[in-house]
Amino acid sequence: MLQPKRTKFRKQMKGRNRGLAQRGSKVSFGEFGLKAVARGRITARQIEAARRAMTRHVKRGGKIWIRVFPDKPITEKPLEVRQGKGKGNVEYWVAQIQPGKVLYEMEGVSEELAREAFALAAAKLPLNTTFVKRSVM
């Protein structure tokens, strides 16, 4: 699963996920893309589950790009532990997603097959997405 090899600090503050995606909002590698419509956060496991669903549907044909990376650590305290005594341990990593962010890209397959594959991937993700095509400038 995806996670940073090393970080400057082990734990991060919660922070806020405001605004729209300025960077990574256009399809730039493949022909088709899966774009987030809502804001939220995607765990490394969800990114991997969606990738597997797409890869299996296109039967390893074409090329897939993952455009998001989980770089934010999420901490949790163990069950039945009282509050206090410091921040919990890092349990998993998430990517914070703003509306307009392209999550996955694909090329080398037909549009119909890409739509089906992205529909399977979208079912694995906790936020609403839409299918987009590369726009020629």
UniProtKB/Swiss-Prot annotation:
Keyword check for rRNA-binding: yes
- Extract the Pfam families matched here: Ribosomal_L16
Offer an example of a GO molecular function term for this protein.
tRNA binding
Q: Where is the composition biased (Basic residues)?
A: 1-17
Query: Which InterPro entries would you find in this protein's record?
Result: Ribosomal_uL16, Ribosomal_uL16_bact-type, Ribosomal_uL16_CS, Ribosomal_uL16_dom, Ribosomal_uL16_sf
Instruction: Kindly give the PROSITE patterns that the UniProt entry links to this protein.
Output: RIBOSOMAL_L16_1 (PS00586)
**UniProtKB keywords:** Ribonucleoprotein, Ribosomal protein, RNA-binding, rRNA-binding, tRNA-binding
Record carries keyword tRNA-binding = yes
Name its GO BP terms in alphabetical order: translation
| Chain spans, region Disordered | 1-22
Q: Name one GO cellular component term.
A: cytosolic large ribosomal subunit
User: What does this gene product do?
Assistant: Binds 23S rRNA and is also seen to make contacts with the A and possibly P site tRNAs.
Q: What is the annotated quaternary arrangement, including any partners? A: Part of the 50S ribosomal subunit.
Family note: Belongs to the universal ribosomal protein uL16 family.
Annotated protein name in UniProt: Large ribosomal subunit protein uL16
Q: Which organism is it from?
A: Teredinibacter turnerae (strain ATCC 39867 / T7901)
